[in-house]
């Protein structure tokens, strides 16, 4: 949990607004909010006994990735390289008139899409 909080607060400038234990679920949650207070909140959940909480109706669900809009994708990628973040796809133009995008992984291997609008 600490690595994930550090990743999102340092590289995406999210602010930790709450962190607490959920004893009945043997879990911990943290809420991170956009530093510009645009209303976006990211909830991180760490289950200490993950297998206990996998339910049949969730097995068919597939989570692909998160996406964050960044002002300068090259600057963001450079900062991530300094922090030894895994860069999955270097910045590239999605189409002739589309945004620049790149993909990285968070400390838990979650795929993160970076988008720089043109």
Regions found by a protein language model. Name each.
Residues 42-45, 53-56:
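Unchanged
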């Amino acid at each position: 949990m600490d690595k994930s909080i550090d990743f999102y607060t340092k590289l995406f400038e999210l602010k930790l607004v709450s962190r607490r234990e959920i004893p009945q679920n043997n879990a911990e949650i943290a809420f991170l909010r956009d530093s510009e207070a645009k209303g976006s909140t990211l909830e991180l959940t760490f289950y200490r006994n993950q297998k206990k909480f996998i339910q049949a109706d969730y097995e068919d669900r597939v989570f692909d990735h998160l996406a964050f809009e960044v002002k300068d994708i090259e600057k963001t990628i450079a900062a991530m390289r300094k922090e030894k973040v895994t860069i999955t796809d270097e910045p590239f133009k999605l189409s002739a008139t589309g945004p620049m995008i790149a993909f990285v992984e968070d400390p838990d291997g979650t795929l993160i899409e970076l988008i720089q609008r043109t």
